[in-house]
Swiss-Prot record:
<keyword id="KW-0066">ATP synthesis</keyword>
<dbReference type="InterPro" id="IPR027417">
    <property type="entry name" value="P-loop_NTPase"/>
</dbReference>
<protein>
    <recommendedName>
        <fullName>A-type ATP synthase subunit B</fullName>
    </recommendedName>
</protein>
<comment type="function">
    <text>Component of the A-type ATP synthase that produces ATP from ADP in the presence of a proton gradient across the membrane. The B chain is a regulatory subunit.</text>
</comment>
<dbReference type="InterPro" id="IPR000194">
    <property type="entry name" value="ATPase_F1/V1/A1_a/bsu_nucl-bd"/>
</dbReference>
<feature type="region of interest" description="Disordered">
    <location>
        <begin position="95"/>
        <end position="114"/>
    </location>
</feature>
<keyword id="KW-0375">Hydrogen ion transport</keyword>
<dbReference type="GO" id="GO:0005524">
    <property type="term" value="F:ATP binding"/>
</dbReference>
<dbReference type="GO" id="GO:0046933">
    <property type="term" value="F:proton-transporting ATP synthase activity, rotational mechanism"/>
</dbReference>
<keyword id="KW-0813">Transport</keyword>
<dbReference type="InterPro" id="IPR004100">
    <property type="entry name" value="ATPase_F1/V1/A1_a/bsu_N"/>
</dbReference>
<dbReference type="GO" id="GO:0005886">
    <property type="term" value="C:plasma membrane"/>
</dbReference>
<dbReference type="GO" id="GO:0046961">
    <property type="term" value="F:proton-transporting ATPase activity, rotational mechanism"/>
</dbReference>
<comment type="similarity">
    <text>Belongs to the ATPase alpha/beta chains family.</text>
</comment>
<dbReference type="Pfam" id="PF22919">
    <property type="entry name" value="ATP-synt_VA_C"/>
</dbReference>
<keyword id="KW-1003">Cell membrane</keyword>
<keyword id="KW-0406">Ion transport</keyword>
Length: 467
């Protein structure tokens, strides 16, 4: 049990999730302690601002029923650390790292600071090995790479929760004898969503290789800020100490940013764009930059954060700043979802900056780059022709243009669309890609190398298409 270094009874104000302590000396930023109200119940606190003679601390257990008068604050001279262990795999925790599954925590193997240990940029290795998610739109076009941070930009009402559960269930590292684990972090999610994830992980067996950190919307806002860091701290321990390849799935980072804005408002800070704090970019970077690979270490940390864009606005500060930090984005389309296509990816708006270095011969298959480049280019042209057809009518188009319309329909219905419980390997994804590309004339596939087209093009499919 920790011995308090100093105690204060000078709580000046309780404001939302924050308390202000006066006449402080020697209290450090990030230091943890506890506040004890008149009822004698201790609540964990963490210092988030230090002045000349005062300190502001966030109460991780919430301030409901906590008065300023009669409360005592004790500080321990230490930063916030959580117990970590390999035996956390298979467990469900809350946003503070405490059990949510009504079972005791396993014996700790170590205690780790939730803020992590930054990787020396010189020691980072460039990500070059793929992660197979089993989802064709990701694996085929925008491959997720070990050590990458690749977010999903979604919108209210779109199936990002289904996608998160599917990725947790299906993701794997192929051809590797090294261990693979998933850390799932739910940030500010509703009880209904938490029950869905817990039931889904248990029912499908995904929990056997996963750690779930669930912070509910009804939990204190300070815990919402802590939850992603708890999940990443567990993931970093599994990766850097035990050699696991860890995929960290975080949903919903919009809830995190809303919590950040609430805390900033409570501290009386000058707001930035749309009321969010001016340091939100830096704060998000402290989360996203914890992904990567390190020279001399076997493991890796890959991040797959999900955020909902308010009003589907990709220029909103949350997706805007996220895009500056991460290495691409996967954008979900409301129009595709309206067509009944799952997962409803917006192929043209999506991007993975590292995918080109993690695909090809020896990694996925020799034709992977050719398929991805050709599919995207052909679909982009097909969308232009589809718009033209709405003006002049399909009957007035040439036979090549009509081929592109058939290709676009097949691409959406056969390549992009797949079942929630359907898992496709890289080979299956690429084979479907060639099936839909073969609707087009062979001389239209200019983004593929001639020798690759000659080897994989399905001429019998081209000849069987009815116009």
């Amino acid at each position: 049990m920790l011995t308090p270094v100093v105690s204060y009874t000078t709580v000046r104000e309780v404001k939302g999730p924050l308390i202000v302590i006066e006449k402080t000396r020697g209290v450090s930023y990030g230091e943890v302690g506890e506040v004890i109200g008149p009822d004698g119940e201790p609540r964990r606190v963490q210092v988030i601002e230090v002045g000349t003679d005062y300190a502001v601390a966030q109460v991780l257990g919430g301030t409901l029923g906590l008065p300023a008068k009669g409360s005592t604050v004790r500080f321990y001279g230490k930063t916030l650390k959580i117990p970590v262990s390999e035996q956390l795999i298979g467990r469900i925790l809350d946003g503070k790292g405490q059990p949510r599954d009504h079972m005791p925590l396993p014996p700790p193997e170590d205690f780790r600071d939730v803020n992590g240990e930054p990787l020396n940029p010189y020691s980072r290795e460039y990500p070059e090995e793929p992660i197979e998610t089993g989802i064709s739109a990701i694996d085929g076009l925008y491959t997720l790479v070990r050590g990458q941070k690749l977010p999903i930009f979604s919108g209210t009402g779109l199936p990002h929760n289904l996608m998160a559960a599917q990725v947790v269930r299906q993701a794997t590292v192929r051809g590797s004898e090294e261990e693979f684990a998933v850390v799932f972090v739910g940030v500010g999610i509703k009880t209904e969503e938490a029950l869905f994830f817990m039931d889904e992980f248990r029912k499908t067996g995904a929990l056997r290789r996963a750690v779930a950190v669930l912070n509910l919307a009804s939990d204190p806002v300070a815990e919402r800020i802590l939850a992603p860091r708890v999940g990443l701290t567990i993931g970093e321990y599994l990766a850097w100490q035990l050699g696991y390849h860890v995929l960290v799935v975080i949903t919903d980072m919009t809830n995190y940013c809303e919590g950040l804005r609430e805390l900033s408002s409570g501290r009386g800070e000058l707001p930035g764009r749309r009321g969010y704090p001016g340091y939100m970019y830096t704060d998000l970077a402290t989360i996203y930059e914890r992904a990567g690979r390190a020279r001399g270490r076997r493991g890796s940390v890959t991040q797959f954060p999900i955020l909902t864009m308010p009003h589907d606005d990709i220029t909103h500060p949350i997706p805007d700043l996220t895009g500056y930090i991460t290495e691409g984005q996967l954008v979900l389309s409301r129009a595709m979802w309206g067509k009944g296509i799952y997962p409803p990816f917006d192929v043209i708006m999506s991007l993975s900056r590292l995918a080109k270095d993690a695909i090809g011969e020896g990694k996925t298959r020799e034709d992977h780059k050719d398929v991805a480049n050709t599919l995207i280019a052909a679909y982009s042209k097909a969308l232009e022709i589809r718009n033209l057809a709405t003006l002049v009518g399909e009957r007035n188009l040439g036979w090549r243009e009509r081929r592109y319309l058939r290709f676009a329909d097949a691409f959406e219905q056969r390549f992009i669309k797949q079942g929630y419980y359907e898992r496709r390997s890289f080979e299956e994804t690429l084979d479907i890609g060639w099936d839909v590309l073969s609707i087009l004339p062979e001389d239209e596939l200019t983004n593929a190398r001639p020798q690759i087209t000659q080897k994989f093009y399905r001429r019998h499919i081209f000849e069987s298409v009815q116009l």
